[in-house]
């Protein structure tokens, strides 16, 4: 695959992920809390959470997602996946990785639902550097 084709492919994948995040915006309560305890992160409010997620997605070059488990009930959704990507170096606050690292992020998202809206999203994460930059 040429460099141009690879860039186009990566851009399409990122656009699809960004469009997905924007489409799911209304599933969040206006006062939703997003937390990643392992990184000491907390984001509050629907617009801030979506902006935060878009910024994180934009920092993942050539993301490859593997979906591991999904379960939902009226009150909770559990979404477990792994994503491998080259870290752009900005956009994932307090990430234990450096710019240019090829990493695998395993994330379990626990979404608490009330009245059909996500009111709390907790992300349990495990970061692994598969190949350090340089």
Regions found by a protein language model. Name each.
Residues 12-13, 38, 100:
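Generic anion/oxyanion-binding catalytic loop in active/binding sites
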Residues 2-3, 51-134:
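A beta-strand edge to alpha-helix "cap/lid" segment located at domain peripheries
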Residues 11, 28-29, 42, 106-111, ...:
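Secondary-structure boundary/capping motif
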Residues 18, 28-34, 72-76:
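Short acidic/polar alpha-helix capping motifs at helix-coil junctions
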Residues 31-44, 56:
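A short gly/proline-enriched turn/hairpin at secondary-structure junctions
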Residues 1-30:
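Short acidic-aromatic low-complexity motifs
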Residues 19, 48, 123:
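Residue-level recognition of oxygen-bearing side chains
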